[in-house]
């Protein structure tokens, strides 16, 4: 089980999801549900200026296998002064090296970690904390199943894959309850705590954050190993500002109710 100092604040990663050159948000990760929010660089710079230390940058076209926004994402990464976590369509050595060549601090690997365990183990060994593994999951008939290829294929049973990744020495996991993503109905705290308890790797929460209370709830389990959270639609929809979210997370770390 991963454990973290109680006084450490939850790290927030504002998301910039890119499709067809635009910053967009999806509902439950489904292609065709995009809402456009304009130029990705404007969104990323806005979050940087608001105090973000990380940006979660996603190439949705690459994730869905329908194209690439690589040059644009490379340009965005190059213009930022904060850490970038890059995700979407990273499935082999070539695409991994290409992603890291943008200057990003970390890449997320999803589908390939499910479909090619040997390659996944090699990547974990070679790249260490430059690689996080994304576990996108949905409850099906009472069982947590993983989703791959832009959430369109089955990737196996969550706990079996988690045991394998933990034994391979995975350095970080990004956990998404697909049913919560883009729905603004709260993160699945119980699932996140269960995953954190089953691994030594720190967990990044993704999907469902809708309020400052959600931020506080996640910040309250940092010491259990859920040390970061990706925030997307709630910020774009104006549910709260990034400044407010950062203050809420820091308030929990300080032991005050803000």
Curated annotation (Swiss-Prot):
The record's InterPro entries line, in alphabetical order, gives: Aldolase_TIM (IPR013785), His_biosynth (IPR006062), HisA/PriA_Actinobacteria (IPR010188), Isoase_HisA-like (IPR044524), Isoase_HisA-like_bact (IPR023016), RibuloseP-bd_barrel (IPR011060)
Q: Please give the catalytic activity noted in the UniProt record.
A: 1-(5-phospho-beta-D-ribosyl)-5-[(5-phospho-beta-D-ribosylamino)methylideneamino]imidazole-4-carboxamide = 5-[(5-phospho-1-deoxy-D-ribulos-1-ylimino)methylamino]-1-(5-phospho-beta-D-ribosyl)imidazole-4-carboxamide
List the source organism.
Answer: Corynebacterium jeikeium (strain K411)
Q: Please provide one cellular component term from the Gene Ontology annotations of this protein.
A: cytoplasm
Where found in the cell? Cytoplasm
Q: What is this protein called?
A: 1-(5-phosphoribosyl)-5-[(5-phosphoribosylamino)methylideneamino] imidazole-4-carboxamide isomerase
- List the EC numbers from the record: 5.3.1.16
Q: Which is a Pfam family this sequence falls into?
A: His_biosynth
- GO terms for biological process, alphabetical: L-histidine biosynthetic process; L-tryptophan biosynthetic process
Q: In which pathway does it act?
A: Amino-acid biosynthesis; L-histidine biosynthesis; L-histidine from 5-phospho-alpha-D-ribose 1-diphosphate: step 4/9
């Amino acid at each position: 089980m991963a454990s973290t100092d109680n006084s450490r604040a939850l790290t927030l990663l504002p998301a910039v999801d890119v499709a067809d050159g635009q910053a967009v948000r999806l509902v439950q990760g489904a292609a065709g549900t995009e809402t456009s929010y304009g130029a990705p660089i404007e969104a990323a710079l806005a979050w940087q200026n608001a105090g973000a230390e990380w940006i979660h940058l996603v190439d949705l076209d690459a994730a869905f296998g329908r194209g690439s926004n690589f040059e644009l994402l490379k340009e965005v990464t190059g213009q930022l002064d904060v850490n970038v976590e890059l995700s979407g369509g990273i499935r082999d050595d070539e695409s991994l090296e290409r992603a890291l060549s943008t200057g990003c601090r970390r890449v997320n690997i999803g589908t390939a970690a499910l479909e090619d365990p040997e390659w996944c183990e090699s990547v974990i060994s070679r790249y260490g904390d430059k690689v996080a593994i994304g576990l996108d999951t949905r409850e099906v008939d009472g069982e947590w199943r993983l989703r791959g290829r832009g959430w369109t294929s089955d990737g196996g049973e969550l706990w079996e894959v988690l045991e394998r990744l933990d034994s391979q020495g995975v350095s970080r996991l990004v956990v998404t309850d697909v049913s919560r993503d883009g729905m603004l109905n709260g993160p699945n705290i119980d699932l996140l705590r269960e995953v954190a308890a089953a691994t030594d790797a720190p967990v990044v929460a993704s999907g469902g954050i809708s309020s400052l209370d959600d931020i506080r709830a996640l910040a309250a389990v940092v010491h259990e190993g859920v040390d970061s959270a990706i925030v997307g639609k709630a910020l774009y929809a104006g549910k709260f500002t990034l400044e407010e979210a950062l203050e809420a997370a820091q308030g929990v770390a300080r032991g005050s109710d803000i």
